[in-house]
Amino acid sequence: AYTNKIPVIVLDRRVVGEDYTCFIGADNKKIGEAAGRWIAGKLNGKGNVVELKGLMTTTPGQDRNSGFRKGIEGTEIKVIFEADMKWLEPEARKEMESALARFDQIDLVYAHNDPGAHGAYLAAQATAREKQMKFVGIDALPHEGVAYVKKGILDATFQYPTGGAEAVATALKILRGESVPKKIVLGSRVFDKANVEQGGRELP
């Protein structure tokens, strides 16, 4: 389409090459790194972490992993268990059951999305260990991650903005013949117990 002079807006996931008019999306690597730094702060730079990954064949999964690892660099935090839960809550619960069976000391679970973090919480709750660890997810949808933080299930969730409104606004600009940037990076917020009632805190 792009080579035939038809404008193309790429939303959410990066594509190979430059055959598009505008890419709109958040920076998953930056979000993962912010999560890593938040986790390092909460654990005072040391502890045992379980990482439940999204589909690692996808760029969001890869970026949320590499960003997180960068965020905990230079700390004594150990990732003692990691598994690909394919973005699915039941898979995350199953993987967390394995982690709980293998490790007595788990300080925090970092999941690449909120359903993953919730699945891990349910697994820990089933063994009466949910109070022994913290749970962190990504996406921060109002009815999901943000609601879980308000209920005290998750300790934090990092927003992944979907960019629908920005995509429509960009499409209208293109139709009006206005120029648009090649890349629009959307900002993100963290919602934790300290700020969730105030609408979260913007990431720098």
Predicted features by range, described:
Residues 14-17, 29, 55-59, 85-89, ...:
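Solvent-exposed loop/turn segments at secondary-structure junctions
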Residues 56, 60, 71-72, 162-204:
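Hinge/cleft segment of the Venus flytrap/periplasmic-binding protein
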Residues 1-3, 68, 80-81, 85-147:
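Hydrophobic alpha-helical
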Residues 31-36, 59-77, 91, 95, ...:
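Short, solvent-exposed amphipathic alpha-helices that sit
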Residues 39-44, 100, 171-179:
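Short, hydrophobic alpha-helical segments
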Residues 1-30, 34, 41, 48, ...:
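Flexible loop/hinge segments that line or gate small-molecule binding clefts
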Residues 7-12, 25, 48-52, 81, ...:
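Structural recognition of the beta-strand scaffold that forms the well-ordered cores
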Residues 29-36, 40, 93, 161-168, ...:
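Short, amphipathic alpha-helical "lid/cap" segments that border enzyme active or binding sites
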